[in-house]
């Protein structure tokens, strides 16, 4: 019998472990998000051994704290993600119309208690984490809880958005409590936002998971406040809310596969639009302005035909995309020039609402996540003791897109988190904020990067165009005008410059450097987006 010294075995084992270096397919992990504190939260989670799913959930909860006007735990969520060496999957956690909603009520206001649908963000984030994360939920939520409890200094974008809603904020007691300063006035630069009640709400979620939000004391406070003020949500509505598996749609673009989500996401329109782009002959920036804007307009005519499989298949058809592109090419006309350019200031239009973030890790997991309250500040309602704003779901904001609203329906919107792959490897993942501008922003950035081969950062800051039963609108503000060669198309009498931050969407993207197997990211130049890299 051979005797082996136990001490030798222990020492050998230690040496073996210390010499082992984990090999991963990619050299870094990354996050691109609308706020530096959210990107920082994702990086903290990476540093603790978390993956792209943990980082996405941490950053998403953080965004509900630091950008409360754009998204929140009272809102809705859509996610598309690719597991390392796995499938591309989707999560539908959008808001749902309560069972007691009265469909005959045609005169609903555009905000207030009667517009609030059943929230989905908390259920969606917890589902994403439970299925894919590696850290515990408490650890993942620590950054958001700390920021809510200790406070942070407001950035200019959030101050501007809150200031624009001052009259509506003053209409609701809970909202006044949380979103006016200590003097009862709008926040100004230098103000610190401390959210003790929101911190307590997040702590309960971190401890009890989905049940902590949809049942128990939080649910009771929500229902009591909403019911007492003319809203529809009941305890049963909250308890019965479930996350659904989204249908992933796939199309083709310039040799890449594009993946996004079916209803309640507008993924079919996103795919159709970029497939039309792909068939157009774009030789210069004049072509870009005229033809891309025409493609946007043609594609948007199909938004109302997404609610059955035959219509969706027709929308996704490459043959249909080629037909539309041919019509655009054949119907192009010369435009007269007008030196008296009309510049339109749309500061009074809701700008860039919603929040999108993208994460990727060294293992190859990729997450593209969009969450929202609807328009700026959603319903403008917050319940005392809870600390967060509710969504808008019923009423004119979303009503009429795909027919009559009825109990149990989920809110359809332009939200379209998107992933591009080649040979089953992610090459670009992105999404956008900005209502109807979301598919437009996603596709124009993707076209600039994947087909015109601009650097990702340039693709995000180049001017975007829009047209739908309107003149051609083109982005024109600080950060965009540096591309002076493009001034020629702003002289057309059919073009109006839009001088408003985030009007054309806020895109946050991650792409793969396929040679060095390294993730690179870029944040939209409008407002305070940032990228954080962890090696």
Where are these regions (language model features)?
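Internal maturation/activation junctions in enzymes
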Residues: 282-372, 386, 494-499
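Bacterial N-terminal signal peptides
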Residues: 8-16
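Short beta-strand scaffold segments in enzyme catalytic cores
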Residues: 71, 75-83, 355-360, 417-419, ...
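Extended C-terminal subregions enriched in glycine
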Residues: 363, 409, 442, 451-501
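Noncatalytic scaffold domains of N-terminal-nucleophile
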Residues: 20-40, 44, 48-209, 213-215, ...
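Short, small/polar residue-rich loop motifs at catalytic or cofactor-binding pockets
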Residues: 244-245, 351-354, 413-415
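Active-site rim segments in enzyme catalytic domains, especially the processed small/beta chain
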Residues: 65-72, 80-82, 89, 232-233, ...
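Bacterial N-terminal signal peptides that target proteins for export
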Residues: 1-8
């Amino acid at each position: 019998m051979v005797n082996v010294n136990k001490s030798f075995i222990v020492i050998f084992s230690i040496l073996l472990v210390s010499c082992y270096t984990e090999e991963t397919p990619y050299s870094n992990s990354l996050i691109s998000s609308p706020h530096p504190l959210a990107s920082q939260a994702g990086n903290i989670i990476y540093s603790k051994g978390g993956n792209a799913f943990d980082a996405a959930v941490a950053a998403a909860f953080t965004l509900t704290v630091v950008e409360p006007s754009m998204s929140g735990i009272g809102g809705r969520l859509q996610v598309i993600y690719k597991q390392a060496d796995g499938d591309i999957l989707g999560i539908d956690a959008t808001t749902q119309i309560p069972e007691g909603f009265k469909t005959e009520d045609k005169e609903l206001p555009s905000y207030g208690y009667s517009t609030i649908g059943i929230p989905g963000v908390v259920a969606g984030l917890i589902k994403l984490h439970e299925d894919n994360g590696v850290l515990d939920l408490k650890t993942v939520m620590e950054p958001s809880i700390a920021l809510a409890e200790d406070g942070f200094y407001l950035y200019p974008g959030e101050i501007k958005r809150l200031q624009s809603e001052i009259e509506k904020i003053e209409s609701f007691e809970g909202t006044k409590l949380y979103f006016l300063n200590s003097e009862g006035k709008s926040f100004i630069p230098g103000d610190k936002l401390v959210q003790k009640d929101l911190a307590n709400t997040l702590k309960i979620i971190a401890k009890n998971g989905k049940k902590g939000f949809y049942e128990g004391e939080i649910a009771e406070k929500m229902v009591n406040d909403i019911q007492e003020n003319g809203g529809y949500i009941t305890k049963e509505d909250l308890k019965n809310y479930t996350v659904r598996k989204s249908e992933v749609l796939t199309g083709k673009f310039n040799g890449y596969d594009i993946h996004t989500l079916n209803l309640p996401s507008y993924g079919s329109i996103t795919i159709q639009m970029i497939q039309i782009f792909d068939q157009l002959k774009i030789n210069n920036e004049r072509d870009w302005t005229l033809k891309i804007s025409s493609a946007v307009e043609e594609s948007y005519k199909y938004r109302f035909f997404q609610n059955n499989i035959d219509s969706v298949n027709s929308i996704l058809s490459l043959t249909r995309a080629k037909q539309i592109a041919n019509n655009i090419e054949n119907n192009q006309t010369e435009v007269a020039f007008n030196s008296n350019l009309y510049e339109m200031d749309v500061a009074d239009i809701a700008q860039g609402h919603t929040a999108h973030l993208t994460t990727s890790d060294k293992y190859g997991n990729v997450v593209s996540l969009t969450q929202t309250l609807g328009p700026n500040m959603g319903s403008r309602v917050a319940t005392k003791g809870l600390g967060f704003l509710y969504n808008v779901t019923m009423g004119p904001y979303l009503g009429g897109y795909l027919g009559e609203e009825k109990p149990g329906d989920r809110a359809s919107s332009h939200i379209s988190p998107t992933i591009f792959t080649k040979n089953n490897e992610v090459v670009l993942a992105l999404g956008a904020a900005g209502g109807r501008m979301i598919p437009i922003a996603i596709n124009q950035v993707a076209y600039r990067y994947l087909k015109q081969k601009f650097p990702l950062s340039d693709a995000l800051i180049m001017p975007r165009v829009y047209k739908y039963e309107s003149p051609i609108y083109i982005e024109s503000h600080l950060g965009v005008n540096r591309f002076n060669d493009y001034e020629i198309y702003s002289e057309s009498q059919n073009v109006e410059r839009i001088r408003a931050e985030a009007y054309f969407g806020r895109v946050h993207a991650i792409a793969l450097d396929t040679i060095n197997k390294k993730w690179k990211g870029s944040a939209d130049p409008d407002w305070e987006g940032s990228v954080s890299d962890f090696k």
